[in-house]
């Protein structure tokens, strides 16, 4: 059956700021306390979406979350009206204010893990929400992510959206950032590659930075998504690269159809994995970048592998990269050599995503890949599909509500909270989502 890949990109939230919340993510740590520009950030993301849509790629949007997230502060014992709580936490525990104000939901590669209908035992598209258990600010996301996905993938005859795994370290799940699918045509059965950093009885794990994804979680997600057991491979990421800042597999590898583009040090038993894939995937091609051409540290600094690998109608592939790759002489030299060689990657497109990149999120972090047949695509909420009208409307929306300068101290401004809620109220109407945010369901009571 004919199917296409649709990229659902996350809209950057109004509280996008640099707080260094993500230990193991070196860009996040390095840019802590810098001044951010939320309006520029959301527009950089929108420009990427629109450019790819104009080039013929199917593109959609996923909204940001409600931030600052007052319900989490109430859970932590702060009381009073919303404004009183903001004032208290800013004075008593400002780090908590930053955590509940993170715009991290924009990196929707961590929103869920997707199984196309061609791979599922029941013939449905499955999406399992990620619990993001390793970081408090990200563990807040799952309930609203689930509500958003249910509002986008509404037709229960076509889609099954599963709640996140229990919030325990044993089942730490980071979503599609640790998942790749390989195969031929999108509509044909493929091989799903689940990548983990640790498993309970395996002492091989990183020493410096946490391994966020467990094998136990990956196995549970595969079961929830009803992936045919004959179409699954579980592989461990190289713990040494996790300790060099590769906190998700999509920082060191990306796949599309029959191609796996990765660093030669990406996986723990890479030769074994490559041989498995060669046996299981017709026409499989591994493009392994040697360390002598691009070091792991340069790959992390430029996000070479946190790229999008997209299929054109003629079967050739486009590699979508952050500008940092072009700015690095060695990486750019390698990329020009890559497109000149005999492989499906024949073109490169560079985008300026510096606002997201400074927090450790490149092109691949910003998108969730969902393979859909024509019938399934017609069942998706049409209001989220990118087109000229939506692009214009979202830019006008951003101009109205987003600030062009934000510091950690600004998060205590009650006006920012009100601006954010008003903006999301307008956005849910624009995208026909219904009442998906807690403030819409409670009337934002002052408690």
From Swiss-Prot:
Gene3D superfamilies, A to Z: Succinylarginine dihydrolase
Family: Belongs to the succinylarginine dihydrolase family.
Active site: 174, 248, 365
Catalytic activity: N(2)-succinyl-L-arginine + 2 H2O + 2 H(+) = N(2)-succinyl-L-ornithine + 2 NH4(+) + CO2
HAMAP family: AstB
Chain's role: Catalyzes the hydrolysis of N(2)-succinylarginine into N(2)-succinylornithine, ammonia and CO(2).
GO biological process: arginine catabolic process to glutamate; arginine catabolic process to succinate
Protein name listed in UniProt: N-succinylarginine dihydrolase
Species name: Salmonella gallinarum (strain 287/91 / NCTC 13346)
Enzyme class: hydrolase
Domain of life: Bacteria
Record-linked Pfam families: AstB
Name of the coding gene: astB
Gene Ontology terms for molecular function: N-succinylarginine dihydrolase activity
EC number, UniProt record: 3.5.3.23
Residue sites binding substrate per the record: 19-28, 110, 137-138, 212, 250, 359
Subunit text: Homodimer.
Pathway(s) where this gene product acts: Amino-acid degradation; L-arginine degradation via AST pathway; L-glutamate and succinate from L-arginine: step 2/5
NCBIfam families in the record: arg_catab_astB, PRK13281.1
Keywords associated with the record: Arginine metabolism, Hydrolase
PANTHER family in UniProt: N-SUCCINYLARGININE DIHYDROLASE
